[in-house]
């Protein structure tokens, strides 16, 4: 089977990591792959290391040649700009395409977006919430739920030891997310204010950068907090997962929350908000704790509960390990294979 994966993002974040993971697994299973990517993205350097055809396209209107997809069975779209590339390529050369949608925002009611989604042979959402949002806009389309799979990271014990020394004798809570409004960092800071008076040994480390950083830093100064540290974007997440005691993810909206899966895979207990696709991952009191979005008191209470209750921590770690089996890359790759094959079967019957 020959699949053309398209991801035109200029950066490299969760969606690109998940695309790369699927590509890597499919190569192991014997797929032939073509990848269309943005030359500005770090994603390209990773693809060049793999045994697949790479096409560089700086815009969805670029690189439309029959030779790119003439041997491909399906075009697989992985982000918002890529869908328009797939629409053009499909219209010109007749190759069907599917779309994986990773965010839980309502689909835009714009003519080009509607055309692009309407012409897709199948649509995929990572979570129940995303599937629901797709159905609202395109109720007649074939829609599948296929979650992303957790990425595993290497661990350098020397780096872990350095983190431990920096936060010695503290219960280390990490939030690993870009500093964007919907990621809920303001709720984290508000919770830190409550925790500072409650337990001086709990420390919150914010791993990520973004437009909200200055605002959040000012809030920390205003509250005179000594239990919050801004550490910027971190490239060695495996070391942080190994060093931390708890991961929190109090987003106001979230497609799925792949960082939660990554933390579970690293045997870290997790707390997340009851928003978007996060409840698809966290079964409250079993594989993690759920709190309502924007509720700083509930978040502070949950953090304190995990910090002070070792049996609960162990229970959540065990539950997390059991939960991630449902998100294993071999399993999710098999689900995509079923989608591809159904498209080929229907095409043969026409």
What are these model-predicted stretches?
Residues 233, 252:
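Aromatic "clamp/platform" in nucleotide-sugar-dependent glycosyltransferases that forms part
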Residues 36-37, 269-272, 282:
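Short hydrophobic beta-strand element within catalytic cores of glycosyltransferases
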Residues 55, 119-157:
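Donor nucleotide-sugar binding/catalytic pocket of nucleotide-sugar-dependent glycosyltransferases
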Residues 13-24, 171, 178-194, 204-207, ...:
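A conserved mid-protein helix/loop that constitutes part of the nucleotide-sugar donor-binding site
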Residues 77-83, 104:
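Short His-centered aromatic/hydrophobic patch
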Residues 217-232:
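Nucleotide-activated donor-binding/catalytic signature segment of Leloir-type glycosyltransferases, i.e.
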Residues 284-285, 289-296, 305-311, 325:
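Conserved acidic donor-binding segment of nucleotide-sugar-dependent glycosyltransferases
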Residues 69, 97-125, 137:
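A conserved, positively charged/aromatic
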């Amino acid at each position: 089977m020959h699949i053309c994966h398209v991801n035109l993002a200029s950066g490299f974040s969760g969606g690109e990591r998940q695309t790369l993971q699927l590509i890597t697994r499919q190569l192991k299973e014997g797929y032939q792959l073509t990848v269309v990517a943005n030359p500005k993205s770090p994603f390209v350097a990773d693809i060049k290391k793999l045994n697949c055809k790479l096409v560089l396209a700086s815009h969805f209107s670029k690189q439309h040649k029959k030779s790119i997809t003439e041997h491909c069975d399906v075009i697989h779209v992985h982000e918002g700009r890529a869908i328009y590339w797939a629409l053009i390529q499909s219209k010109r050369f007749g190759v069907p395409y599917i779309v994986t949608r990773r965010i839980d925002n309502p689909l835009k009611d714009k003519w080009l977006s509607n055309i692009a989604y309407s012409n897709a042979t199948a649509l995929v959402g990572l979570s129940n919430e995303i599937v629901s949002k797709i159905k609202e806009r395109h109720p007649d389309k074939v829609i599948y739920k296929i979650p992303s799979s957790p990425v595993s990271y290497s661990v350098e014990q020397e780096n872990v030891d350095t983190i431990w020394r920096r936060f010695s004798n503290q219960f280390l809570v990490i939030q690993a997310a870009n500093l964007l409004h919907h990621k809920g960092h303001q709720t984290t800071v508000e919770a830190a204010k409550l925790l500072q008076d409650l337990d001086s040994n709990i420390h919150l480390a914010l791993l990520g950068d973004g437009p909200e950083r200055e605002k959040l830093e000012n809030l920390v100064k205003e509250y005179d907090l000594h239990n919050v540290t801004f550490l910027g974007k971190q490239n060695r997440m495996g070391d942080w997962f190994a060093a931390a005691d708890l991961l929190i993810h109090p987003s106001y909206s979230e497609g799925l929350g792949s960082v939660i899966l990554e933390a579970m895979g690293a045997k870290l207990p997790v707390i997340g908000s009851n928003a978007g696709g996060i409840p698809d991952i966290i079964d409250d009191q079993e594989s993690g704790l759920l709190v309502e979005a924007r509720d700083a008191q509930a978040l502070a209470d949950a953090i304190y509960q995990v910090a002070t209750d070792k049996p609960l921590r162990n229970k959540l770690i065990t539950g997390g390990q059991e939960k991630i089996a449902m998100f294993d890359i071999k399993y999710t790759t098999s689900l995509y294979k079923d989608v591809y094959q159904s498209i080929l079967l229907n095409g043969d019957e026409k």
